[in-house]
């Protein structure tokens, strides 16, 4: 994997920094594991905008990723690594001994020809998936289940990982990249290692158009709007009317807590670093 800084042959290329991975498959993805991925433009069934700054972008197929890893005891060979436009991590196409193919999140160090496995008897090796109760304390894991059988929900993006720091009865304690320490049911599964493509954070898109290719539209500041459009709108010159920063719907935007699910607070041992 290499970090390439483009030559300034045009204003749009001057600031581009690309991540080039020669190990990624250059052909088409595996068709049986593709699904249609329709764009909504941020509109709901009434045609009204419910998510701002969404629209346009390149057409994409959704890759069906195996987040549950339930084929226990059947080894699988990594056929190739692929780019996935729907996530920051790369994905791996694996071929099981019974002939089935699935996509999984590609962990750091995984390459074509490697063998991965899932189940309680799987060895502690990058890419193998086991219940948390069978993984040694101190291990680094990713693709962690919060609810057993639901599929991985934690540490799925490029470079993400969690560390098992304690085991207590039916729960294990994880330290996340954010610094948060959280209890998770030990019956839930996790994959050994950290997610690959950690250099993803170093890329620079270089121009506004590259953001538009990804389906992201421009953001207009509230103070540049009219009073009918935003609480900060109107006034002569740039003035917010002396009001603390709020969203278009009047919700404070800096330091205001919006977490609603208080029932799971008991699982958080320590809040994230700020």
From Swiss-Prot:
UniProt keyword annotation of ATP-binding present: no
Cross-referenced SMART domains: Ribosomal_L2, Ribosomal_L2_C
SUPFAM superfamilies xrefs: Nucleic acid-binding proteins, Translation proteins SH3-like domain
Superkingdom of origin: Bacteria
GO biological process: cytoplasmic translation
PANTHER family: LARGE RIBOSOMAL SUBUNIT PROTEIN UL2M, RIBOSOMAL PROTEIN L2
Keywords (A to Z) from UniProt: Ribonucleoprotein, Ribosomal protein, RNA-binding, rRNA-binding
Protein name as catalogued: Large ribosomal subunit protein uL2
Gene for this chain: rplB
Disordered: region residues: 223-274
Ribosomal protein as UniProt keyword: yes
Source organism: Aliivibrio salmonicida (strain LFI1238) (Vibrio salmonicida (strain LFI1238))
Entry similarity comment: Belongs to the universal ribosomal protein uL2 family.
